[in-house]
Structures are given as C-alpha cells and as structure tokens.
Amino acid sequence: MSCVNIRGCRIGEGRPKVILPIVERTEAAILEKAAQFSTLSADCVEWRVDWFEGFQSPAAIARCIQKLRVALRDKLLLVTFRTKAEGGEQALSHPEYLAFLRLILDTDCADLLDIEFFTAGADLPALVEQAHSAGVAVVCSSHDFAKTPPRAELVCRMVQMQQAGADLPKLAVMPQCRADVLELLSSTAEMADLHPETPVITMSMGALGAVSRLAGETFGSAMTFANPGQASAPGQVSLDVVNAVLDALKL
C-alpha cells in the first residue's frame, strides 16, 4: 500500500493514524476543543463544519478555520462538510457545496479536504485537481447509514475514487449482520492487495462494526476516528482504547 506524506505524517504506513472529530456549534467551543486536542495522542483533527452555527457564512468559516489552524499546532487538519444526504447535520445545494470546498481551499489552512463522492458527482476530478493545486490532500468519501453493499461494489467505488485522483478513498457503511462486517474488511484487504495505488480509510459503523475501527493495520485501513468525548458517528471508540488496541495489534 502506498503512503500519503503530509508534513511528515506518513498515512498508509505502519500504525493507522488517529483522527479526532470536532462537532461543536460555536467558534469559542471549537477553539476550546482544538486546544484540548492539540495535546492528545492523535495525528489529525477533523472539523465538521456542518455542525458549526456559522456554516452559512463564508466570513465566519474563514475566520474560524484560521484560528483553528493556530490552535491545533502541529496536528493535521481535515475539513469536512458532511451533507444531510450522507448523514450530516445540514443540507447544501450542489453549487453551495462546491462553493464551500473552494472557500476552504482559498483559506490555505486545511491539510486534507473531505469531498463526498456522490455529492461532487461529475465535478470530482476537477475538484481534486483544484485541491492538489492548493497543496491539499483529498479524502473522497461515501457513507451508507442503511446497509453494507456487496464487496465488489465497495471495491469498485474506491477504485473510482482513485481514478478521480483522490489521495484517500473513504467508505463508511452500516452492517446488519456479522457477514456485513466481513464484507467491509474483505473489501479493505482487497484494495490493499490489488489496488495499492493509494491508502484507503474504511469503517463498519455501529457497535457491530467497531472492530473494523481497530483492525486497520491488519486489513489495510490507514486512518481511524476516535471518540475523545463526543462521537461524530455511531460506533466510534474512545481515544484511550483506540490507542491501546492499535498498539497491541501493531504488526
């Protein structure tokens, strides 16, 4: 599996890198959380802008992200607007979503930018190119909160993300049975073995899928989300447990 090197953090090499989500509503609460996270044993912080009370104000977003970048010190910053269609807090029109992505790139504060595979649609390759021109790595994401598609479909979707130029394809799916968790893990291993052009980020959500968040080094998922107090998705495991298990399962 290849590696994405961002400011010395080698994503896709060795231990999965740990992401902490910020899902606060106000700028003050976001910055307070960022200051706390800057001291914790994690590699990256995700700002979920769809939770931000000022998500409709470009000026408020730009002001907050600039302060956030300073508060996080050396932590990587992943910026995400999770649309309502993909399990997020707010809905955006297609033009609004594209404008948000371009705003984040213009701030020159993000290390990684989440771009939703289905929301971006035909604009995805151009958006990836714009991000790369701005020196920002792309996490191309797809979320299914209802089911786990078959392995072949999961692999096909991640390969399409690779073909569009994404640095880190990301899939999150909901299991309905144990076999669904195995489908997700198997698709992850297949990507690592047969399509190693990029690292991938995968997870099976909910309590049933929690094991997938802890076994990334074994199966080939390069990053995992941990719960530092407030989860941003079902099944997130606490930071202390994540770090302990990742250390115990290190290859």
Identify the residue ranges that each predicted region occupies.
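Short boundary motifs at domain starts and secondary-structure transition points
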Residues: 7-13
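Catalytic alpha/beta core domains of metabolic enzymes, predominantly
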Residues: 112, 117-251
